Each structure stands twice: as C-alpha cells, then as structure tokens.
C-alpha cells in the first residue's frame, strides 16, 4: 500500500515522534476512506471466517462504525464501541452487562505501547471476555508483539541498529 507509506512518511517529516505524530497519524487515517476500507479487507483476510466479537475505540472507532457499522454487525458476533482518550489514561467504559462473544479482536488506527488495548482488555476480562488479536494500521512498537497484526510496521521500514551477538562477543 504505497499510498499509506507515502502519507506516513510525510507525517514523520512534519512530526518525527511523540503525541503530535500520533495525533496527526490518527487524523489522517480517520479522514481517508480508502485506507479504512483497505484496513477492513486486511482484517477480514486474516480472520478468514472465524467468528469473533470486535472492539473499536475513540474517534477511529467512530469513523469505522460510521462507514462500516452494518458490515461490522454482519461479520462479527458482537460489536463494542469504547470511549476514546485511552492512551492518555482515560478509563474505558463498556456499556454492556453481558457480552455477545468471549473472544474479541481489537481494531485501532495505531499501536505503540499497548496502553489502549491493555486498558480495554482489563475491563473486558471483568466481563469474561478477552482480546485474542489486535489489528492496527500503524504499528510503532519497538518490539513486535505476536498478537498485533499491522498494515505498516515502523521498525520494519526503519529498523533500529543494534549490534548483533557476534559484534558483542568480539568486543
């Protein structure tokens, strides 16, 4: 997806790191219907007919739900939209007494430390549910997490230079 790569590269030129980068990235993703649609196809290609509930959060969740709400209800056993601001420490609120699934996938625009996902997983666990996979458009985590699938992974495009074990041993 060259268009996504180009847009992320442009944001990185303007905002090399931190909250300004993620705010600009999130706004760009929410405003690009082609990226949202490609993301949904990416998710469907990875779950291949398995039935999960789906969780979305914040402005990204609202954008996905507004554009694809009916599609989400047709393809997932439960749809949960959670309040935003979670990466800034807000507590997620799930307005359900009973879940429609046990296993959920979490869809988000970006992933860095897992704060948003982990806070939702904590509340979901109190309702006997769990997040089994996280799907994101942009993964900026330094260490790849096996349960996070992304369309763009920063450290695959711009790897950190670490000395290999042979370099360390020869010092």
Locate the predicted segments by residue.
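Short glycine-rich phosphate-binding loop at a beta-alpha junction
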Residues: 50-60
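Alpha-helix N-cap/loop-to-helix initiation residues
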Residues: 62, 113, 141-142
